[in-house]
Amino acid sequence: MPELVVLTEQLLSPVPGGTGRYTRELLTAMAASTPPEWTVATVTATHRDLAPAVVPNIAGPRALPLPRRGLTALWERGVHLWPGGDAVHAPTPLAPPAVKRGRSLIVTVHDTVPFTHPETLTRRGAAWHQAAVRRAVERANAVVVPTNAVAEELHAHAPGPATVAVVGHGVSEVFRQHMDPNLAALKTGRLRLPETYVLAVGTVEPRKGLDVLVSAMAKPHAPDLPLVVVGPRGWGEVNLVELAAEHGLPAGRLHVLGRVDDENLSAILRRASALAVPSRAEGFGLPVLEAMAVGTPVVHTDVPALVEVAGGTGLTVPRGNADALASALREVVDSSAATAERVAQGLLRAAAFTWDHAAAELWRLHVRFFDMANAR
């Protein structure tokens, strides 16, 4: 009975971010759809507490005999430490440097930011990710990417023999289910949020473009609404309070929440007048999909992956253009008929993105490449 081992190290990261969310959601769906002849287990590096990496109905996590830094260095140097299992899935580029005979390896590459926008990462982070992605396309059986945009960029910046498969993300059930408006209001009230606001969701770091959004919200033609920012602090000196003061956005119009759970995020999204996604670079943009699923209008930049995911259901603005972003947000908030049409289209489009579909596609790939590895 073959075993699929999934590396869940990202769940133990100080800031799991979107890749951590992807790991947990995908694993949960894969556990529910495991082929009868397969089993699934998880593996991490050594940590004091492995509890954050526990996924219901999946064995593990089993800790490899190295801390994260040691495991990363070992694989970076090309040492062939196989994490166990007959097939391995790496939900991030942290992956074994080569495939054992009779085994198979699939790696998810979420974006090409290290190649296209290295300045938005630390120097070491950009270099490590570039090398890890190049290893994956050279040595893994397949590389999974979330959008056609990333597939095209990957081919341009890191071509290799690995099969590149596009498998989109999904929308969690908490964003699909109906939530009583009174309950949503109660939840946002407990968080001391205003009744109406423009929302941004994501890790607070340079590539998210929050500096442009703060500047846009301070423009005289922007909607006269508060700005709510949800998400953990990442790397980089992105101080939202200082940015607000610099651009003339009154302190009372900025609300920074930090990380929230999915139940509260669902309520926050539902109560928002608009979701603003001012990113400089993205591989998918899960908040866009989640906003579409709850019926909240979206304004996003012209990053190819965001344009692809939104599919014409959001308003698109040029990256880095605060004036255009302010105007688009005003249009979404003020133009009820056009906004209602975009929201209706967004609801239909979001329904096509499910974690069950993503899990089915991943299982198809794993079974295919494991069978190929054992047919030689």
Regions found by a protein language model. Give the residues of each.
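Carbohydrate transferase catalytic cores enriched for Leloir-type hexosyltransferases
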Residues: 1-376
